[in-house]
Amino acid sequence: MRSGGRILVSRRELIRTGALVASGCALLPWPFAEASTTQELSSSADAGQSWTIGNDRIKRVVTFLPKTGLFTKQFSDLSTQAEFIHQGTAPLRMAQEFSFECDGHNCAGSDATFELLGADESTLPKGTCLAVRLRHKELALEVSVIYCCYDGHPAIRKHLVLHNAETRARRISHLNIESIGVALGPANENTLLTQYGTVPRETYYTGRSEDAGLLVANGLSGNGIAVLSEVPGYMKRTEIDGFYSPGQVRIGVLYDTDLMPFERSIGPGEAFTTASVSLVAFRKGDGFNDPQWLLPSYAAEILERRIDRQGPPWIYNTWEPFHRKIDSAIVYGLIDAAGELGMDVFTIDDGWQREYGDSAVNLKAFPEGLQPILDAVEAKGMKFGLWLPLAAIGTSTAVYRDHPEWAALDQESKPKITVTAAGPKAVMCMASAFREAAAARVLDAIERFRLAYVKLDLTTIFNAYGEAPGCWAKGHEHANWAESLNRIYEGIAFVTQKVYDKHPDVLLDLTFELWGQKHIIDAGLLAAGDLDWMSNVDDSQPNSAGPLQARQLLYQRAASMPVESMLIGNLHADLPTIQESFATAIGSAPVILGDLRKMSQADRQWYRDKIGWFKKLRRSARISESFFPLGSWQQTSPAAWDGFARLAHSGNGVIALFRNKWAGVAATVQLPLMPAGRYKLTSVMTGKDLGVFETSDWVRGIPITFADAQTVEVLEVTAINV
């Protein structure tokens, strides 16, 4: 429908195309109707410019035409020769490139109201970046569109920088970072895997907080695109439309617009940098082009901050079974045992401090302070870690007494209170000056106690147990409640960056409670921290949820998130399930709990031997380059076996198999994507050689027999160089 040289788009069409989602209607520039396909745009009389970003595996060509704006002209997987944009078939509304609303004005990359300022290329340590700089013709607003690629990865990572050149603040909403239409084939051939890339869904889909990695692909050719959003937590929204545009799948990666509506004010002369979005090209079943190789490798090397360089440390944590009843007498016994097991980091969880939000030591539990504890930890060859609540603090603390105005307020303007193991605590707003105080407190603890690892915990934006989100206070750094949501996530990143600026080697663990949802992990969290204490699986008894449910969490997330950033608590080392706990722990970032003092000397030595073996393997083989779930991985069950393989590109690595209560005797392990070659299998549990196998054996399946009472098998895979 035309009106005044523009096209009015219905609500259904608006939502369907992802153009300024849920704004009621959109005004699309008149050239959209005149030049409705990329072919027509490319052949128009406009004097345009094009730039290419890519490497030997991926290529993206972006074009700017004065009458039509910026759009992606070509997106190619050079490894598979797949072309994701077919010239002459992509409607321009499918290729907006980006979009947002600024003070009521609808803005899109493919909008004639933007003019080109220029483009710059720069180099990264292992890649390149392209920055295309635009200026709005009517608003004093500049937008830089940044595209990055990395050596060896078929991925383009994109973000925006919005610069306010006005003398007053601007308000941004409905922010769509990536808006692109890709050609995968007929609509009835396309498939979609959601959440972390493991849950099949219909191809017309809205992704939310847990949709950290979506895989859209052609079910026949296997060609596809993985979408990895670094928008944090509940701010995340992804639109997939594979229904309504024949031959095209519309992908929109944006901040949320309804449940947790994004708003952001940008002050005069200030800039806002969006989260990044990665599009990773793949082909299922095609060797190293398969997402089970590509995504773990990309996520580990690019999205993780530093864990992938040397592998994660083995961490012991005191939370279970001691909770807040931890004291120095208990800790000294645990230190001795943890040292014997070969732990790298000894962490005291909640209970060491006098009050939440105050790093003064609880002298009732630790009468000599923590210095003797620290000395004992280091004497055993370990490093020290502590638990710290970030924004949940006691009202008796100096920071609360001096600055009660920094507290988060609810909708009735009352201070927000969260329930903790130490009773009700105030929730401070991370979108206020409190973030400076929080950063100073974390830095003080790191420097005072020589911390190598910090577990940052508890409520920030809101908790994982139903408390209302955000802050309604006036006078903070957010203009309203909606703006507080993303600003709080920004506040968390502010604290972690302050720490990294002074102590780049410290590992920061951002727990699921800090991020606001049970079992959550996403690339936004990894952009702010190193590790994610992802869950507290009960493992207090042999028949607890324990390792079986820990692996359920692992398998569902490992398809797109780096497993070595996942701390899946709370596996106990002192239970009779010692082999299962160890084998489960090596699937992710290994964290062990339990009363280690109860372990026999034989069990301690067993753990030390196995941990030593795994550390040696991890140093020699980059097993972060893949993750293959095995057996009944989609639903772990006592009635079926499950397992995983973690392999380097060389083929070296580890396979862990769990019999559970399955009545069978042999698990058939199929790894059709195993690199070509010959491989020796050795049982880590028994030391026995199981034989030498070739690629064809892995395709057919190799039967691994469990002995009568055996429930766990761990196999080392070693490539035989001929």
Model segments located where?
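C-terminal beta-strand-rich structural cap/linker in extracellular carbohydrate-active enzymes
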Residues: F693-V722
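Conserved, mostly hydrophobic/aromatic
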Residues: R57, L160, G269, V377, ...
